[in-house]
Amino acid sequence: MNQFAQCRAMHQYYRDIFTRTIYLPEADVMPSHLVAEILHFWSTDYAAMEPAIMAAPVPPELEAEKALAIKHLLCAATLANQAFDSKKQGHQIAAAEGFGEQVTAHVVEALKRDDAVNLVVAAIQLLFRVGEIDGAVFLISNHLSRLSNSAPVLKILLLICLMEEDYNQAQVVIQTLTSDFALIEEESLVLLMIVCGIYKLGGCPDSFIDFRPLNEPLPLPDYSRYTWHIPKAATDNTTVLVSCDPNYFFEHAQALVASVYDTNGTALDVHLHIYNCDARCEARVREMQAAFPGLNFSLSSEVIAPVRGINVHYASRRFVFLRYALEQFDAPVMLLDADCLVRKPWADVHTRLDDADLILTCSDGAPLWERVLGGFIYARPTQANFRYLDIVARFIDRNLAAENNEWFLDQVALSFALDTLPAVEQMQIRREEA
């Protein structure tokens, strides 16, 4: 690993998830309201908190250097709270110049006074949260023997290894985590990292998420589950495919259809695939047909029983239907998230994309299970595309049947199915930055 470019580029969500909880019992010597504001309520008011922290009284028997170490670490935490994804409403906003260095300076001042394990772990978490990956890895390397049972550090290290594709080091971390399940703490993201790492190392996990469908020629899903309410008229137009439940249909999909009509007129068809579609949904679709004259509508549905992880079913089953729709329509299909809007004529966009047969979206700095994003796919009905989508559909269908209703299942399928394609077919896929 060098420079940690991928870790620096990854979404703040991933730098937050293993750094939200800071275990620092040493801070109990500080006024409880200050500690709570910083470590539990994630105060970002450094201007107010820093002087309060530094002036806070501590027990007289506590060594002055140890007290100062705790104070510097709390100052670092107050600064690092500014990096939380929740503080930026999910937007990726670059930190102010010198921000990382300021956090690092407090960490250095803390650890040169007291390098107790809890302080080192907290320091690693704070540096990782603000994107100071070099500093975090430096501390891990220097204190490795003392951190072998630290769950937060092992999880952070595994994420760094996977992001930077250092699978040799990842294997060591995976072995450590899986040797003591208490370290994993049943966190779904940790289990996701482990199974993805094992697959990249040549294994084939069959629990949590079952990777066997990537390599086994299983039968295709049972497409007889689909019910047609409004048949698809045969056209050569690209069909916009929108799959959602009734709530999302009424909250979002109607606006999406309106944006398709506003920007593309009747040049695109629209197919709505509504999970647990009821009479109210069908009636509304027929009203939309009248409201958008000339727009070719079609409607299908499937029944999904209430289950744990129903949102995973909603997100994933659309890719199973995509494979079926591509063959049934015998025309290009563009899958879109129901809560997006179309802003430009598709013909202009597709020309700019070299009239590609398969267009996938990606994101710089995405982890390996998000190499392909699920919000947009364009596919023509070619044999190469059928092969790819067959694998995706089998993977999703088998995992949902096994109740592996894990978040990111759809993107795991889309991302790892690419690895099974011949190199020449992979090279022909157009990848666009989301």
Place the predicted regions along the sequence by residue:
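Non-catalytic N-terminal targeting/anchoring module and adjacent flexible stem/linker
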Residues: M1-Y223
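N-proximal low-complexity "stem/linker" segments adjacent to membrane-targeting elements
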Residues: F208-N247, E251
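Short, acidic, metal-binding catalytic loop of nucleotide-sugar glycosyltransferases
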Residues: S259-A267
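Active-site-proximal specificity loops/subdomain of glycosyltransferases
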Residues: R280-Q328
